[in-house]
Amino acid sequence: MFEYLKGIVAKIDPAYVVLDVNGIGYKILCPTPYSYQENQPATIYVEQVVRDTGITLYGFLSLEDKELFLKLLSVSGIGPKSAVAIMAAEDTDSLASAIQNGEVKYLTRFPGVGKKTASQIVLDLKGKLGDYVKKSAVATDLTPSLQDALLALVALGYTQKEVDRITPKLAKLPENTADGYIKEALALLLKK
């Protein structure tokens, strides 16, 4: 019903924000409520979910995040609260990359996601997030030292899937030497 709401952020809670739109306060459950600032204007992309227990608004920073939420909802066994919890636990680029690469073990890290549900997520969504993953990869401009580090990781025996999953995180770090990137990459890879 709603695509987005524009207004002033009236309140921020760990699970939701209250957005004042022309004097009406909308409670919107968000995976990342602290991305907004109180008493500041905001546009929140929303999805209205109607259940027997009530009507709930779920909000997102971007239209792409909202689309990822809807795709997670299409998976058997994933409800709106689980989808928000999954999106809150990890940045969406890494999440989309893990699904695209079929990393079931990685997906079991999320709250309420066991091996069966993780397998179902991969089964239902693998191949359907290509545009989302490509957008994040194209937006990432890799420095020569980062490219060298990624090649070294593959030479060390890590799979291309594992390297692709951590590449967006490494690209967001301050520019470093190849050795510095390798140390950061190993810390991320061993953190599984």
UniProtKB/Swiss-Prot annotation:
<keyword id="KW-0963">Cytoplasm</keyword>
<dbReference type="GO" id="GO:0009379">
    <property type="term" value="C:Holliday junction helicase complex"/>
</dbReference>
<dbReference type="GO" id="GO:0005524">
    <property type="term" value="F:ATP binding"/>
</dbReference>
<dbReference type="InterPro" id="IPR003583">
    <property type="entry name" value="Hlx-hairpin-Hlx_DNA-bd_motif"/>
</dbReference>
<comment type="function">
    <text>The RuvA-RuvB-RuvC complex processes Holliday junction (HJ) DNA during genetic recombination and DNA repair, while the RuvA-RuvB complex plays an important role in the rescue of blocked DNA replication forks via replication fork reversal (RFR). RuvA specifically binds to HJ cruciform DNA, conferring on it an open structure. The RuvB hexamer acts as an ATP-dependent pump, pulling dsDNA into and through the RuvAB complex. HJ branch migration allows RuvC to scan DNA until it finds its consensus sequence, where it cleaves and resolves the cruciform DNA.</text>
</comment>
<dbReference type="InterPro" id="IPR000085">
    <property type="entry name" value="RuvA"/>
</dbReference>
<feature type="region of interest" description="Flexible linker">
    <location>
        <begin position="137"/>
        <end position="140"/>
    </location>
</feature>
<comment type="subunit">
    <text>Homotetramer. Forms an RuvA(8)-RuvB(12)-Holliday junction (HJ) complex. HJ DNA is sandwiched between 2 RuvA tetramers; dsDNA enters through RuvA and exits via RuvB. An RuvB hexamer assembles on each DNA strand where it exits the tetramer. Each RuvB hexamer is contacted by two RuvA subunits (via domain III) on 2 adjacent RuvB subunits; this complex drives branch migration. In the full resolvosome a probable DNA-RuvA(4)-RuvB(12)-RuvC(2) complex forms which resolves the HJ.</text>
</comment>
<dbReference type="GO" id="GO:0006310">
    <property type="term" value="P:DNA recombination"/>
</dbReference>
<dbReference type="Pfam" id="PF14520">
    <property type="entry name" value="HHH_5"/>
</dbReference>
<feature type="region of interest" description="Domain III">
    <location>
        <begin position="141"/>
        <end position="192"/>
    </location>
</feature>
<feature type="region of interest" description="Domain I">
    <location>
        <begin position="1"/>
        <end position="61"/>
    </location>
</feature>
<dbReference type="InterPro" id="IPR012340">
    <property type="entry name" value="NA-bd_OB-fold"/>
</dbReference>
<keyword id="KW-0238">DNA-binding</keyword>
<keyword id="KW-0233">DNA recombination</keyword>
<dbReference type="GO" id="GO:0048476">
    <property type="term" value="C:Holliday junction resolvase complex"/>
</dbReference>
<dbReference type="Pfam" id="PF01330">
    <property type="entry name" value="RuvA_N"/>
</dbReference>
<protein>
    <recommendedName>
        <fullName>Holliday junction branch migration complex subunit RuvA</fullName>
    </recommendedName>
</protein>
<dbReference type="GO" id="GO:0006281">
    <property type="term" value="P:DNA repair"/>
</dbReference>
<keyword id="KW-0234">DNA repair</keyword>
<dbReference type="InterPro" id="IPR011114">
    <property type="entry name" value="RuvA_C"/>
</dbReference>
<dbReference type="GO" id="GO:0009378">
    <property type="term" value="F:four-way junction helicase activity"/>
</dbReference>
<keyword id="KW-0227">DNA damage</keyword>
<comment type="similarity">
    <text>Belongs to the RuvA family.</text>
</comment>
<dbReference type="GO" id="GO:0000400">
    <property type="term" value="F:four-way junction DNA binding"/>
</dbReference>
<dbReference type="GO" id="GO:0005737">
    <property type="term" value="C:cytoplasm"/>
</dbReference>
<dbReference type="InterPro" id="IPR036267">
    <property type="entry name" value="RuvA_C_sf"/>
</dbReference>
<feature type="region of interest" description="Domain II">
    <location>
        <begin position="62"/>
        <end position="137"/>
    </location>
</feature>
<dbReference type="Pfam" id="PF07499">
    <property type="entry name" value="RuvA_C"/>
</dbReference>
<dbReference type="InterPro" id="IPR010994">
    <property type="entry name" value="RuvA_2-like"/>
</dbReference>
<dbReference type="InterPro" id="IPR013849">
    <property type="entry name" value="DNA_helicase_Holl-junc_RuvA_I"/>
</dbReference>
